[in-house]
């Protein structure tokens, strides 16, 4: 029983029903969070207060924004027999062997939408053409480069994809926008609705493993795993030029190959090299390890390196503030920091020692999965450019800040099967340096890549599908099809105040004019994806605050619910040397330096490999991180 509405005069009227479901303690915490939100203060707080606010908000989301979908019908098993990551994600949860496996249900962070609006209201092609389609390329400045853009595809292909039905749908652009649509109509497969055994309800199934298990390079099942392995010394297949091998069809050989492009494949190849290097190290230290033991241990180590790079490197660049730098490092190392954790281990619980290395996983009473809402806020195709700017690495005048431009390659030449051949001609180093020196797109209105509105999509086996698709329109359709709430309903479910006028969303007068036109001045009709791209951003954030609060919940959950980042994150499972490999790797730059020792010295000035390489490094700040004042 929560506080009565009369005790909360400052509470937004549309949030009373949310508070009424809370315990007294949680309602009290919510009032604190809500007051801070109304004043717009949390990101202006000194670091410690900002981190405290995020801790309170995360607690509330863990209590009220985790919704399980589907039956729980797994079996118990002996965790000592499965001290490795299985091919299909089974046997991770300590008491249920199917939680988090391939083919499990995609969960939710809130109930499905109760919206009265139809799936074509307004038409997705109208939304895509009038509000999303790129008019001119808007970049992200020096904060995020094309490597960072590729990284998030690398992660999504590790985590989640929806099972599709065999039933085909056709979207035909209305006459008012047809002339501006690259495709006047397009066909696609709808998301398959699978019965959940819960009062005739249905849900969607994940064809990938939702654990942070590196399945993007290892595969999501036994067949995929066998395809990528050499079956000698634990290693994975890689070509002599350091890029992915390709089969007789020209399809890359890697864990997940659907809808790939050269930048994505480059990261797959880099971490195949990382895996194989771990195998070499382990074989030298443990000559009695057979192929299977080497493979399993190297996979654990490599997956942990990927998770760590994402947590304390990529995310920190995405949310470039002192508060989020502190928060993400606390997630991994705890409040006491790396030095203390390295000396004494994870002895002091999640707050002081971090989520990694906990005695047992914590799913907060809701079986682990990734969620529909998580998928929606990770729709970041605006990060992709129209062309890749190729840098000349053989020029006599080597300029680390701004290497000479050799030429621009249209992105359409870097996708699908032809991407592998193009990458081989260019070489790993030229591709990586070029991506590092190019700013990616900004997540804003009118910045959706035009080439993705006339796209050849691929099947799970990497083969091209017969029908071109308009991804901008399709993404609007997908959120509605899957019951993801629209923008205002989404915010209310996330314990945020809804907007009551367009000016609260954006200061852009042109955007307000078009939003009113497209949504018939009905603010409740606003699509989530459009709202996230239109929303005013916190200084330093590449994403919206609304999207960030889903990140806040799920980023922690991916670590704390996983047995191999908690109970089994130890020397017995990883080996002493394997654990040291993870503990001494802090950034993507560390991984690059391991395999290309002189590359970053010659071509990179900045502090993170995810920032534009020619930009200035982070300035030295002598004030301890936790004691820094408001920005």
Curated annotation (Swiss-Prot):
It holds the Pfam family An_peroxidase. Keywords: Dioxygenase, Fatty acid biosynthesis, Fatty acid metabolism, Glycoprotein, Heme, Iron, Lipid biosynthesis, Lipid metabolism, Metal-binding, Oxidoreductase, Oxylipin biosynthesis, Peroxidase, Signal. Its EC number is 1.14.99.-. It is an enzyme of class 1 (oxidoreductase). Heme b binds at residues 157, 381. Glycans are attached at residue 583. The active site is at 378 (proton acceptor). Residues 1-20 form the signal peptide. The keyword Membrane does not apply. Its cofactor is heme b. One of its GO terms (biological process) is long-chain fatty acid metabolic process. The record marks 258 as: Transition state stabilizer. Expressed in seedlings (cotyledons, young leaves, and hypocotyls), flowers, siliques and old leaves. One of its GO terms (molecular function) is dioxygenase activity. Belongs to the peroxidase family. Alpha-dioxygenase that catalyzes the primary oxygenation of fatty acids into oxylipins. May be involved in the senescence process. This is Alpha-dioxygenase 2.
């Amino acid at each position: 029983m929560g506080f009565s509405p009369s005790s909360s005069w400052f509470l937004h009227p549309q949030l009373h029903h949310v508070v009424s479901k809370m315990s007294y303690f949680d309602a009290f915490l919510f009032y604190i969070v809500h007051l801070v939100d109304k004043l717009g203060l949390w990101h202006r707080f000194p670091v410690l207060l900002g981190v405290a606010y995020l801790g309170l908000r995360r607690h509330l989301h863990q209590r009220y924004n985790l919704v399980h979908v589907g039956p729980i019908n797994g079996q118990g098993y002996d965790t000592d027999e499965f001290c490795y990551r299985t091919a299909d994600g089974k046997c991770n949860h300590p008491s249920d062997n199917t939680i988090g496996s391939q083919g499990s249900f995609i969960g939710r962070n809130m109930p499905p939408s109760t919206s009265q609006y139809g799936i074509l209201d307004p038409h997705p092609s109208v939304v895509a053409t009038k509000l999303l389609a790129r008019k001119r390329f808007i970049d992200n400045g020096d904060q995020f480069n094309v490597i960072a853009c590729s990284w998030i595809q690398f992660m999504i292909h590790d985590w989640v994809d929806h099972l599709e039905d065999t039933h085909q749908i056709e979207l035909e652009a209305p006459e008012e926008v047809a002339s501006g649509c690259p495709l006047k109509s397009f066909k696609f497969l709808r998301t398959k609705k699978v019965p959940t055994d819960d009062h005739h309800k249905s849900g969607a199934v994940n064809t990938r493993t939702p654990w942070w298990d590196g399945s993007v390079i290892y595969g999501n099942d036994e067949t995929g795993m066998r395809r990528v392995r050499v079956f000698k010394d634990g290693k994975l297949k890689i070509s002599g030029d350091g890029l992915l091998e390709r089969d007789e069809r020209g399809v890359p050989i890697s864990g997940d190959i659907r809808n790939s492009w050269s930048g994505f494949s480059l990261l797959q190849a880099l971490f195949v090299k990382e895996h194989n290097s771990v195998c070499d190290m382990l074989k030298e230290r443990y000559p009695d390890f057979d192929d299977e033991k080497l493979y399993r241990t190297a996979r654990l180590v490599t997956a942990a390196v990927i998770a760590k790079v994402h947590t304390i490197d990529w995310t920190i660049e995405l949310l470039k503030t002192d508060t989020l730098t502190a928060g993400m490092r606390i997630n991994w190392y705890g409040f006491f920091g790396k030095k203390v954790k390295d000396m004494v281990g994870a002895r002091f619980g999640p707050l002081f020692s971090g989520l990694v290395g906990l005695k047992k996983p914590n799913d907060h009473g809701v079986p682990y999965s990734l969620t529909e809402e998580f998928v929606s806020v990770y729709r970041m195709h605006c990060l992709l450019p129209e062309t890749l700017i190729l840098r000349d690495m053989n020029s006599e005048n080597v300029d680390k800040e701004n290497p000479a431009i050799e030429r621009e390659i249209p992105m359409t030449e870097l996708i699908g099967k032809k991407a592998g051949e193009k990458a081989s001609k260019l070489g790993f180093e030229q591709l990586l340096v070029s991506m590092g020196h190019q700013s990616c797109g900004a997540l804003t209105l009118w910045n959706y890549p035009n080439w993705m509105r006339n796209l050849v999509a691929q099947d799970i086996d990497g083969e091209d599908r017969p029908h071109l698709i308009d991804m901008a329109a399709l993404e609007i359709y997908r959120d509605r099809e899957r019951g993801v709430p629209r923008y205002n309903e989404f915010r209310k479910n996330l314990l945020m105040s809804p907007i009551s006028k367009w000016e609260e969303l954006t200061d852009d007068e042109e955007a307000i004019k078009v939003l009113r036109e497209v949504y018939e001045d009905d603010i409740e009709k606003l699509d989530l994806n459009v709202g996230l791209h239109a929303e005013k951003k916190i200084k330093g954030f590449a994403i919206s605050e609304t999207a960030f609060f889903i990140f806040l919940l799920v980023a922690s959950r991916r670590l704390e619910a996983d047995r191999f980042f908690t109970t089994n994150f130890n020397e017995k499972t990883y080996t002493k040397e394997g654990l040291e490999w993870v503990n001494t790797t802090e950034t993507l730059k560390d991984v690059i330096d391991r395999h290309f020792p002189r590359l970053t010295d010659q071509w990179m000035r900045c502090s993170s490999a995810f920032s534009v390489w020619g930009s200035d490094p982070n300035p030295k700040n002598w004030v301890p991180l936790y004691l820094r004042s408001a920005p």
